[in-house]
Swiss-Prot record:
Keyword Ribonucleoprotein: yes
One annotated GO molecular function: structural constituent of ribosome
The species this protein was found in: Prochlorococcus marinus (strain SARG / CCMP1375 / SS120)
Protein name: Small ribosomal subunit protein uS14
Pfam families in the cross-refs: Ribosomal_S14 (PF00253)
Amino acid sequence: MAKKSMIARDVKRKKLVERYASKRKKLLDQFHSAKDPMERLEIHRKIQALPRNSAPSRMRNRCWATGKPRGVYRDFGLCRNQLRERAHKGELPGVVKSS
């Protein structure tokens, strides 16, 4: 089980990403469409002024069962250990052993 503080930090980041997603997208669209270097610089400064944790790249995929940050399968949202356990128990529909 991951530390509760780390899980809470990721939840906080997820909320920030959702809150600033539209503003960040609008600024990035303006940045990519701008031709003037000074205008691009000004837009870049606005993007940098947004909270650091509002960037989607700062989010971490975590296992929803244990909160572990590593070895997480995107399709299931589970870490490798939980995926194996639940697959053996038959709790994951459509997942079968290969041999």
